[in-house]
């Protein structure tokens, strides 16, 4: 059982929902990332999605695009991101880390070298936004051999046939994108999400995490009621942007944002 599967299984047994925050590695500065990861855990994170900065993040809205720009300006590379995870692992052997990014940096490193480096660093899962599961044949065995969970995205428009195909190629959890469009856009329709997630659950045994549109404790609780976990990204990255010159204020602001979400999710426990 992978670290991700273990955490999600334990939460399910407790009747609790996963809180999965996203930050971009290297933003606001590479030296800050490991400390921010620990802050997320202290504030209640169960799993961390760590973004690998890329120059053309096409699925992301302006908030995360700017975070990628800030990180790349500081020279944050894929190998540096691996080093950050390795450093994080020295004092946190338990919290799963999922690398989230685009195919290009992985291809540039080489799939096998990437899988080796990820496993060595203590990475638990990989979500590659622009890698369709049917094209993942090259990486799937490399990930499986190293106990890395491949995580894939489901959209509101994903067909049943495709949901089943994605489920077959996935492990750990699947990431349901609640809104059509880029990250940070629009308002979430919880009733619509509830219907879609219930339908996804009919087609896959994997836990379903829901992201896009979760901005506060209220939306976290609403989405948590109908899913296995909530994924919070743009609002955290926006907070980082607003406090990028003051590390202490930044950590406090992230805690103030995330901790009420944790409490709201735990209030749903049964």
Swiss-Prot record:
GO terms for cellular component: cytosol. It comes from the Bacteria. GO terms for molecular function: tryptophan synthase activity. The active site is at 49 (proton acceptor), 60 (proton acceptor). Transmembrane segments: none annotated. Pathway: Amino-acid biosynthesis; L-tryptophan biosynthesis; L-tryptophan from chorismate: step 5/5. Pfam families: Trp_syntA. Keywords: Amino-acid biosynthesis, Aromatic amino acid biosynthesis, Lyase, Tryptophan biosynthesis. The keyword ATP-binding does not apply. Its EC number is 4.2.1.20. The keyword Amino-acid biosynthesis applies. It catalyses: (1S,2R)-1-C-(indol-3-yl)glycerol 3-phosphate + L-serine = D-glyceraldehyde 3-phosphate + L-tryptophan + H2O. It is an enzyme of class 4 (lyase). Tetramer of two alpha and two beta chains. The alpha subunit is responsible for the aldol cleavage of indoleglycerol phosphate to indole and glyceraldehyde 3-phosphate. Belongs to the TrpA family. This is Tryptophan synthase alpha chain. The lineage of its organism: Bacteria, Pseudomonadati, Pseudomonadota, Gammaproteobacteria, Pseudomonadales.
């Amino acid at each position: 059982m992978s670290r991700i599967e273990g955490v999600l299984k334990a939460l399910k047994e407790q009747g609790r929902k996963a809180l999965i925050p996203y930050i971009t590695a290297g933003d606001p500065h590479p030296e800050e990332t490991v400390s921010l990861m620990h802050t997320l855990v202290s504030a209640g994170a169960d799993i961390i999605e760590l973004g690998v900065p890329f120059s053309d993040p096409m699925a992301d809205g302006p908030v995360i695009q700017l975070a990628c720009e800030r990180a790349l300006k500081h020279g944050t590379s894929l190998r540096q991101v691996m080093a950050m995870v390795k450093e994080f692992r020295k004092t946190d052997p338990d919290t799963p880390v999922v690398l989230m990014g685009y195919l290009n940096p992985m291809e540039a490193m080489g799939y096998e070298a990437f899988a080796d480096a990820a496993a060595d660093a203590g990475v638990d899962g990989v979500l590659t936004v622009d890698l369709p599961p049917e094209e993942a044949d090259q990486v799937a065995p490399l990930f499986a051999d190293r106990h890395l969970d491949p995580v894939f995205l489901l959209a509101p428009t994903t067909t049943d046939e495709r949901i089943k195909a994605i489920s077959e190629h996935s492990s750990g959890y699947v990431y349901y994108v609640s809104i059509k469009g880029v990250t940070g856009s629009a308002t979430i329709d919880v009733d619509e999400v509830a219907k879609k997630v219930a339908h996804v659950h009919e087609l896959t045994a994997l836990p379903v995490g829901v992201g896009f549109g979760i901005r506060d404790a209220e939306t976290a609780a609403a989405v948590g009621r109908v899913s296995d976990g909530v994924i919070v990204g743009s609002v955290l990255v926006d907070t980082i942007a607003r406090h990028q010159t003051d590390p202490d204020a930044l950590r406090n602001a992230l805690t103030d944002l995330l901790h009420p979400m944790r409490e709201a999710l735990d209030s749903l426990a049964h």
